[in-house]
Amino acid sequence: METDKSAALRSGYAPESIDPAFLDALTSDLAAHLNVAVEQIWYWRSHLDVFIGDYLHFKLFDTQQVIARAIGNCSDVALALCRGYGKTWLLAVCAVALAILWPGSRIAVVSKTAGQANLLIDKIVNELLPNADIEREIDYSTGKGSKVNMSGRSAVYFKGGSSIRSYVLGFGGDNVLGIRDLR
């Protein structure tokens, strides 16, 4: 009785019969593609607005593009925008983009009340998750995905190990719940 391996050896399609020159060309071609992919990721990291348009397929207005790029390039961003501008939506999209582009990152949403802190997570779960590009990045395999725990905090977990978590600052900053999770 002939096994699959012996049939492959007989037919000449076994790994032992691959031309070394072909392997060298394949390896160099793969390395070139990997370098292009790394360059693209670094470009997207410094041009967050382009990533949001190219990968997440959201159309941003010009002012939103400027804000998204500032969020991608600065450690601190202060926004003073009018009512109805879409601040929460824009920050949710930017937080998701940062979580995808920087695997293993922990993004904290800190607010005075639990309702305000969970608002951004709710925006991600209810409005952004129907987007197939974002849903593909959410980690459902561990059962985490998105959840709200008993203290009113909520979180979204990504396949790259990133997470977006909400924290309640409280009055005067004395009762930050779960501050040890930020480390």
Model-inferred region functions:
Residues 2-183:
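Phosphate/NTP-binding elements of NTP-utilizing enzymes
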